[in-house]
Amino acid sequence: MLCTAALAATCGLAACGSSQTSSSGASTSKRTDFVLGGLFPETGSLSYVAPAQMAAFKLAAQDINAAGGVLGKSIATTIADVSDADHADQNTAGLQSVLSKNPSVIVGNPSSGVVKNTYHEAEGSKVVMISNGATAASLSGISDYFYRTVPPDTVQGAVLADTIAQDGVQKLAIACFNDEAGNGIRDVVVKHLQSAGVDIVYGEKESFDPTEKNFSSLASSIKASNPDAVLVIAFDQTVPLIKSLSSVGVNTKHLYFFDGNMSDYSKTLDAGMLEGDKGTVPGAIATAEFRKRLKTIDSSLTTYTFSAETYDAVILAALAAQKGGSTDSGTVKDNLASVSGTDGGTKCTSYRACVTALKNGKDITYSGLAGIGPFNTKHDPSSASIGVFTYDASNLPQFDHSQTGKVS
């Protein structure tokens, strides 16, 4: 779920039965004020990823207004903090704050657990929610009103498992937190690795409490399982967990990570501690030009977690309203798939270019920064890239290669 500053510096990835056809007349009473809602984890275990996502959200709104807005009117924005899945009260409070502004769409949250805690209320209010980072496979097709600009864990999990197996690991231990995101990708990785003949010596079913602060017992259990390598699936628990593993003699140069903790550890861990370790990140890598533009919004940015996916979610929603001729959320819902390219049409790479094509009566395929394929019938991207990264001697992740996967 993450794309850090270091990653960016090196290279820039149950059907609900909803219709995939566009609907230019979805609303019986046309609305013309587009209100863009945002839900981001400004507090909690994912707070370090919020700044870049909020910057991308604001940059997309700025670009939309610079191109004439939606239906000729500038859009308004509203943002609320939803924290993480361990703070359900804040999940609800944040959502209700945004819903009170009568949004045309809500972009966020990047946490699968938070989405699980909030999508029902958004659906009940008939407001579209587009997640910029929730990857749990269980979210595919969960609601007519839920979309996402990242692929489900089935894609990243397969690439991560292939990376581990191709490195020759025979015995793998897994340290996984008990969270929707953690358990989801863990299960995908385990399935693929067992098919490849890799023995899961610890963590096939075990998981730790996300609020845990002391990892000495877990580290000792992993050490006792005598693994060749350890897959660490956690958020802000990662640093203390790695330190605990090191303290009991686990080789921290044989670790693997997923998007939730592929981060810059140059200031939090001793130099060389992660050298050679690998991990995967779904979605696109923020390009140098995009990073430069984001810094005009927030000059303090050092990590670019799902910033491209956030930007594209905003643009897609605005284009859906523009195509449908109304800014109510029902119209946005009914036109999202079409502007993503399910109907084919003129390829366009910016809001301005896409709006011009729509005004000329053309169908469009928005080809944005995230590089995803058109939405499928489960409201997932039909294809997406997964980046594979290797840590250098400074504990910075460096891009190695990417693999494009199709979403079933």
Map each language-model feature to its residues:
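Extracytosolic ligand-binding ectodomains
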Residues: 1-408
